[in-house]
């Protein structure tokens, strides 16, 4: 449910936004959700809708970029823009504009390899970049480390629930993963709607297809199937609005 300026949003207000395509679907999903989404003003709501749409687009683009999957210890990147730490994090080089560094991953993906958690962070950053523009992005994010949630500056949080909305990050758990392939203990994905999920290293697949791939990477004698966890990982939109002054 959407609460706008302290009041439940009306159908007339929703219609006044005149959104189309996936943006309209996102708006209606927010309204139909059992979760409550509170906004001070209409521009905050439109910011979230646009951000989620851009996250979906970024996930599709990263899938086509040629970037490879790798465990953290084997991460690699375009050396002109990024330094790879011993832990496998991508650290933006001094005097490289953050927007340029993020865009290079999508433009020269074949030079990059990283874990699925890193891929989600990259998708989130690109979604924000496309939403706020280069100037604001570079002004507020003067240095970047791409690794997992612990290194983000976007106020990423995870909460329980299965009321999924386009652009959410979800997680497929593989409880009996092979110890020889511990990277397949699970898969972080971006929800693209209509049973489509982007998972780095797997591609854009249905839930059944992702579960099948994870099940093939279980340890011998495993009996428990992989499954989609009832949780969502999102960015704090109000925090982002304050951060970028949009």
From Swiss-Prot:
Name by which UniProt lists this protein: Protein-glutamine gamma-glutamyltransferase
Keywords in alphabetical order: Acyltransferase, Sporulation, Transferase
Reaction equations catalysed: L-glutaminyl-[protein] + L-lysyl-[protein] = [protein]-L-lysyl-N(6)-5-L-glutamyl-[protein] + NH4(+)
Tagged with keyword Transferase: yes
EC number in record: 2.3.2.13
InterPro entries xref list: Gln_gamma-glutamylTfrase_bac
Top-level taxon of the source organism: Bacteria
Organism: Bacillus pumilus (strain SAFR-032)
Function per UniProt: Probably plays a role in the assembly of the spore coat proteins by catalyzing epsilon-(gamma-glutamyl)lysine cross-links.
GO process terms (BP): sporulation resulting in formation of a cellular spore
Disulfide bonds: none
GO molecular function: protein-glutamine gamma-glutamyltransferase activity
Family: Belongs to the bacillus TGase family.
């Amino acid at each position: 449910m959407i609460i706008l300026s302290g009041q439940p949003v009306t159908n007339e207000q929703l219609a006044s936004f005149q959104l189309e395509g996936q943006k309209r679907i996102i708006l209606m999903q927010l309204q139909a959700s059992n979760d409550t989404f509170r906004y001070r003003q209409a521009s905050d709501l439109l910011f979230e809708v646009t951000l989620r749409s851009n996250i979906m687009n970024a996930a599709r683009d990263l899938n086509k970029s040629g970037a490879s999957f790798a465990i953290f210890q084997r991460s690699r990147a375009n050396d002109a823009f990024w330094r790879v730490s011993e832990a496998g994090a991508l650290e933006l080089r001094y005097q490289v504009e953050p927007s340029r560094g993020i865009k290079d991953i999508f433009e020269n993906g074949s030079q990059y390899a990283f874990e699925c958690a890193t891929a989600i962070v990259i998708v989130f950053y690109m979604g924000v970049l496309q939403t706020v523009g280069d100037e604001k992005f570079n002004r507020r994010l003067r240095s970047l480390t791409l690794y997992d949630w612990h290194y983000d500056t976007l106020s990423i949080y995870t909460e329980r629930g299965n009321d999924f909305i386009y652009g959410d990050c979800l997680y497929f758990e593989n409880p009996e993963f092979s110890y020889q392939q511990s990277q397949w203990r699970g898969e972080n994905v971006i929800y693209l709607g209509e049973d489509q999920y982007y998972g780095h290293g797997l591609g854009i697949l249905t839930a059944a297809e992702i579960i099948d791939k994870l099940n093939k990477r279980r340890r011998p004698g495993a009996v428990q199937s992989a499954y989609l966890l009832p949780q969502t990982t999102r960015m704090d939109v109000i925090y982002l609005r304050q951060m970028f002054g949009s």
